[in-house]
Amino acid sequence: MKLIYTDDHREHAGAKEMRYDQMIPMSESPERMDLVIQGLADAGFQDIVKPDVFPDDHIHAIHDPGFVRFLEVAYSLWKKEFGPGGFATAYTFGMRGMDQVPNESVHSMLSCYTFDVCVPIVAGTWKAVRSAVDVALTGSAAITAGERAVFSLCRPPGHHASGDLAGGYCYLNNAAIAAQFYLNAGIDRIAILDVDYHHGNGTQRIFYERNDVLYLSLHARPEDEYPFLMGYAQETGACEGENYNVNLPMPLATAWHDYREALQHAISRLQAYRPDVLIVSLGVDTYKDDPVGGFALESEDYLRIGELISLAGLPTHFILEGGYAMAALGRNVGNVITGFEK
């Protein structure tokens, strides 16, 4: 399997995040990707391809142009006010009844275009975010050209980002941009299977009223976990998108037996839908020791996840999302791809 990768992700580094009552170094760090690359190499996957560069039109097909401009200029505006170094982050967030049209103030933009404190912007954030899109689109181009499976090693991740909001370590939605690429290429039926521990609220919002992308998400119950306000089973889509959104929330401490049932159900829905391409938003923060997770999967379970996904029998585009248990991250990702390629 081809691995699409660029070192540009390293530009997004050095910020901190607020986790409940503590300010800590970002869990979403460049070291994550080093471990993923090593884990894939240990599993025998070393066919690394650099991404091509794609026009911004692909981004604007999913994301609001004002939002994209914000991501591009936020740090330079922040630096003018506070000097170099540090990171830009919001002090306030848009609320119901408040004017949400941003002005040229970086504070206004941050308030309008982010929904939590987990998307700090440093000097190199835009370069990393923009390159991650190219990583995703290079994978889409490869599948469109006939590859049966590819893995886009995107960092930062993307599934919490919606059309005009960044949050949850995510800035642009790599999976959604990839899906739109396929549609624009004349591939009519696309499915996204999201196996990250957290619900992909951004992906859901983007496609919720559309019937050209089936979105299925296995995740922790929003009663218990981030993003808290979305990811309920009754959220099935709206308007033309009714029944094109499938949420499979699970309780804390979910282990393989119950997770397998949910994944098998998702695969059955995929097989009934018969998409032309499957995008897998691959997060492994479902692991038992993940610092931001609460499930109880073992490393061996990721082999089984890969095997079950392969049963769909579809051209498959893996896109990296979360996973923060450093000691097992590379092994878990490698196991998914090993199981899939058996």
Task: Name the predicted role of every residue range.
Residues 1-193, 198-342:
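HDAC/HDAC-like amidohydrolase catalytic core signature
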